[in-house]
């Protein structure tokens, strides 16, 4: 009886070990989508979209901050960081054309709006 249990246990362990290696070596095929005129162009206007960059820094054009950004803004505000200090931390020594295209520029503009809103409420 004892031999039967050892044999069953060894068989189970061996089959689990083999199935893990078989699963690890399985490669998934990438899913590619062909670019067609329907998928890449506007059907209604059948025209090309404009590629002009919108570099306006209006507060109305800002997206809503994510939860992580809201927490970061609150942390900066409680530590007494002004938008100027945050701007210096992010962009010190960078050219203005590089700054405008930097993803942190939008975060800085949102913090500036947050800071001005908090200062206005105080």
UniProtKB/Swiss-Prot annotation:
Induction: Expression is up-regulated in spores. It is found in: Secreted; Host cytoplasm; Host nucleus. It comes from the Eukaryota. Belongs to the RxLR effector family. GO terms for cellular component: extracellular region; host cell cytoplasm; host cell nucleus. This is Secreted RxLR effector protein RXLR-C251. A motif (RxLR) lies at residues 48-51. Residues 1-24 form the signal peptide. The keyword Nucleus does not apply. Has the canonical translocation RxLR motif, but lacks the canonical EER motif, which characterizes most oomycete effectors identified so far. Keywords: Host cytoplasm, Host nucleus, Secreted, Signal, Virulence. Secreted effector that does not suppress pattern-triggered immunity (PTI) in plant host.
